[in-house]
Amino acid sequence: MPSWTDRFWYSAEGLRLHYRDYEGPRDKPPILCIPGLTRNARDFEPVADRYAGQWRVICVELRGRGMSAPNPDPSHYHPRYYVADILKLLDQEGIADAVFFGTSLGGICTMLLASTDADRIAGAMLNDIGPEIDQTGIDRIGSYVGKQVTFSSWEEATTTLADRNGDIFPKWTGDDWDRFTRRIMHETPEGIRFEYDIRIAERFRAPAEAPEDANWDLFDALAGRPLLILRGERSDLLSAEIAERMAQALAGDAELVVVPDVGHTPNLEEPEAQAAMDRLLLRVMDRQD
């Protein structure tokens, strides 16, 4: 695993936010990774393993996740605030543009940022997310998000997560489940727990603020930039129909890749996902020349 530096920046409200910074050349855009709803920088270890050194890789932790400070006002657990935080980081680091790798919520943030600051996006990957989301997946996520569970050992945590999610990743091995568990949980004095502020669930369960047409406008803002759409074959959040519609809407810019035998979300270790990310980065470099 490549080494990284833990760095911090501050939100407009003064929240101390964390990111992992994997060194790489400064003469091309960095890869900026934004994780999903309950996830953290460790989710993108496969990206760093593959590209650090060749690319600068920045893995952010959204407010209330990982080493980033929780928000006293849970209504601020919203993509508008996450995007403002990310823009502050880009400005702090003097980064003109980046290749955005957004998993689930991170992809929503990427689309929202494109709608206001498209010039900051040199290319993008949307990992199992789109402008329309299947209610089945929303209901599944809502059934567990915000419910803090404590395990007495890593073995208990790993076994429980494997039992609950085996239909999402039916071909994962014990080692796969162990890595997954250690990426999304951490040790506390009370035991093994998820590493996020459980109050993020309050904003997640709030009614949608915009009609679906507005979400498609956000997606369309990515036009003219190299785009990779990843979909887990078993995904209950991004339907095959919507993924195809996305690829057709931005034909010429977008590549759709379906990762077999996984649900929401591909973990970016799959050969199909890694080959697709390679192609995306080549297209980004072609545009830079």
Regions found by a protein language model. Give the residues of each.
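Catalytic histidine neighborhood in serine/cysteine hydrolases
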Residues: L250-H264
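Alpha/beta-hydrolase fold catalytic core
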Residues: M1-I31, G53-Q54, I95-A96, V257, ...
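Conserved serine/cysteine hydrolase catalytic core
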Residues: E187-Q248
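Conserved alpha/beta-hydrolase catalytic His-Asp/Glu region
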Residues: S152-A206
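Active-site loop/oxyanion-hole signature of alpha/beta-hydrolase fold enzymes
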Residues: R26, P46-D49, C59-F101
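Conserved HGGG/HGGXW glycine-rich cap/lid loop of the alpha/beta-hydrolase fold
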Residues: L15-P70
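Catalytic histidine-centered segment of alpha/beta-hydrolase-like enzymes
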Residues: V262-E272
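Conserved hydrolase catalytic core segment
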Residues: A96-Q135
